[in-house]
Amino acid sequence: MGKHEAPAQEFGYGFRGRMDERYDMVRSVVGKKFIYIRNYMPHKPYGQHVSYMFQTPTTQVWKKMFDEGKLNEAQSHFWKTKPVEELYDLTNDRDEVKNLVKSRQHVDILKKMRKAHLDHVNQIIDVGFLPEGEIHSRSQGTTPYEMARTDKYPFKRIFLAADMASGLSPWATKTLSTYLKDKDS
C-alpha cells in the first residue's frame, strides 16, 4: 500500500498439490475475465475418495447416485476424470461449467493463458513436479526452493516429461518409454 504498492499484475496463479490424503496436481492462471486450468493428473477424477468428505451423508448419496447413473452431466462432473486443459469465462459462466478450450472464438485467450502458465512454472522452477517424498529427500540440508536451483532438480527434463505424459497423446508413448531409462527416474 502507499508508495510501496506494486503495480497490479495481469494474472494470478493457483496451485493444487493434494486434497487431504490424496495427491493431485493442478495449476491455474486467472485473469479479470478468464481462468485457465492445467490438470497434470487428468486420469484422476475431481472427486477422489477423501475419507473426511465421505463421512457426510450428502457426499455418500451424491456418489451413490452417480454410480447408479442418476445424475445429469453437470451433477456428474465432479466424479469424472478431468480434461488436460480447462478455460472458463468467469463473467458468463461463474460456475465453470462450459469448458472453452475447443472454442474457436477463444483460441487467442487460450494461447495467452497457456503461455502465462508455462512462463510462470518455469520462472518459479515449480518443485511440485516431484512427489512430496522426493522433494524432501532431495532437499535434505536445505530448502526445496534452494534445491530447485541446483542440479538436484533437472526441472526442464522433469517438466517436459510431466507435460508430455499428462497431455494424454498416444504419440508421446514411445518418447516417454525412453524416459523410464533415465538415471533420474
Descriptions of predicted regions:
Residues 1-18, 35:
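Polar, glycine-rich mid-to-C-terminal structural blocks
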Residues 1-7, 50-66, 169, 173-177:
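Short secondary-structure boundary segments
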Residues 1-6, 22-25, 138-142:
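Short, solvent-exposed polar/charged micro-motifs at secondary-structure junctions
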Residues 10, 15, 32, 99-101, ...:
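Generic hydrophobic/packing signal
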